[in-house]
Swiss-Prot record:
Pathway(s) this gene product operates in, as recorded in its UniProt entry: Amino-acid biosynthesis; L-proline biosynthesis; L-glutamate 5-semialdehyde from L-glutamate: step 2/2
Protein name (Swiss-Prot/TrEMBL): Gamma-glutamyl phosphate reductase
Keyword Cytoplasm annotated: yes
Gene, per the UniProt record: proA
Enzyme class name: oxidoreductase
GO terms of molecular function: glutamate-5-semialdehyde dehydrogenase activity; NADP binding
Homology family: Belongs to the gamma-glutamyl phosphate reductase family.
Catalytically driven reaction(s): L-glutamate 5-semialdehyde + phosphate + NADP(+) = L-glutamyl 5-phosphate + NADPH + H(+)
Amino acid sequence: MTDIFEVPSPDNNLLDKAEQLRLASIKTSQTNNNERIRALNLMADSLEKNSKEIIDSNFEDYKKAEIKGISKALLSRLKLSKEKLNLGIEGIRKVGDLSDPLGQIQIKKELSKGLILERKTVPIGVLGVIFESRPDAVMQISSLAIRAGNGVMLKGGSEANFTNQAIVSALKKGLQKSNIDDNAICLLTSRKDSMAMLNLEKFINLIIPRGSNELVKFIQENTGIPVLGHADGICHLYIDDEVNLDIALKVALDSKIQYPAACNAIETLLIHKSIAPAFLKKAIPIFNSNNVKLIGDKKAVKLGVAFEANYEDWQTEYLDLILSIKIVDDLEEGIAHIQKFSSKHTDGIITENISNANKFMSEIDSAGVFHNCSTRFADGFRYGFGAEVGISTQTLPPRGPVGLEGLVTYKYFLRGEGHSVDDFSSGKSIYTHKDL
């Protein structure tokens, strides 16, 4: 068995799959907008037609995972209900409704008479996506890849093998009815292959890891392929002193309990000292009734929080019904805490003071900064991107939920009429550098 810290060389079977995928991605890049939209609709149709097989496969995966005793957070992500499947299918169709990301002219400039420069969006090529547990990610990633004219190599967690294979089989059946080569989607099922993927520099143009902190950091450190991703989702919500308590409670609850295993769920709640007694008096019974374990600093414990926090709690991504609570003296202390412990994913403030909100949103350097709304909105589907291939917490773009715009690059096209640099050096021709 291959250890997670071993990166083997790809064997001939994997190299053959990678070459087929590379060739299919080239063909996909040459398809037009209508062909790619039609392919997505056929993929969605096929998922609907094969939904029973997919749900049954997920049931088998879930049973095995329960027996193995995997964490509640992973079990929650693994579960693919009929509702989740339908949302994934809807997401594929919505991706088809989005504007064509390819061939968009970003720059058009006359360099000289008859010498025209354009910068246009083009596919990245082949995406390598490694993810844990969430089988619905297969639908999101595959649809975005095809819409942007890319091929994709997928490796999900072994706990979702049956589900992932059923979904990819359905997607390929859909592609077989389209003008897109079904080899544009490739699923790997062994850990050895997923690690060997890191050595496929000649075939893969971008790796997108979606999983644990350990997995993402390992991939970032062990491949020469560019990596897009985030290693942690330590999100914060700060409740200011000028606040509507009902709004604060509603948003705090949604940010934590709506789906605690999500990377955009809050792990730490910061509360201004003047509002903390009134807020916690209302909040603690509701959190308790929703089975949320509350861990707080000494001030929070004095106000009724059951367990005392230690330093590690402020830098822990629980992905579970556990919430750290800290009482702060003012907005500045809240901002300082977030600046120290945030993973730069999503952080929010609840306040009626616009000046305080603006200060918070300006000084917090996260991919998403929210005012008076749940951190759970940090999602490509909710942003109207159709779906997301992942979330990036890096400062350079793409940043935040990555949809279609993060799966294209650009290329410079220069058309002339026999122009030579020597003509400009000699003064025979001149640059006009005129925007068109």
